[in-house]
Amino acid sequence: TQAGKHVSFLIVTDGRMGSVDPALFGDELVQIRQAESMKSAALLGVTDVTFLPFFDGGMYEMEQVACEIAKQIVRLKPDAVFAPDPNVISECHIDHIKTGLAAKMSMNMAPFASVMQSIGLEGSHAVKALAFYYTDKPNAYIGVLQTFSAREEALSLHKSQFDEKQVSDICMYFTLRSARLGLRRIQGFADGYRALSPTHMHCFPEASEWVR
């Protein structure tokens, strides 16, 4: 948002299954998580936040998530969609994996009016890029030196999910990762993304080798 771009957050799962307080879970935790998400988004300058109704913990069908993401793409008409990389070998968080896979699937749904009509929505929209974060194969880098402190502050607002030590540890990891990625492009701190254009998204396996 600092660069003048309009950003929308789409939160797929409701966070009901995990808290720093083991006695806090279920619907009560969902309400807290949503309030924390809104505060964190506002701090980052994001006012458009949508919550999907999927239970935390992966007990849902990935195809259902893809349909909902596709509907939001048609509604919001974004230039780019950002999602966790589902192809990282070490990633074991099922919600991250399913969300990333659903984002991939939605890329072949939202551009086609006939597909969207089959899931109950008129219209279509083709994004210009799908960018994966939490990736081990970045090919696009964005400098984050000017916004790095806001990331830590936004993370600290998720008090039901992270205690102070966890926030500190995560931010230390972010610092080390951003410094390492920044060195690749000689621009201080940077975030890395695995970015795909529409050309790369279908019947183009060489993109896995060439898009670097």
PLM regions and their residue ranges:
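Active-site rim/loop-helix segments in enzyme catalytic domains that contact anionic ligands
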Residues: 1-76
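Metal-dependent de-N-acetylase/amidase catalytic core
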Residues: 60-212
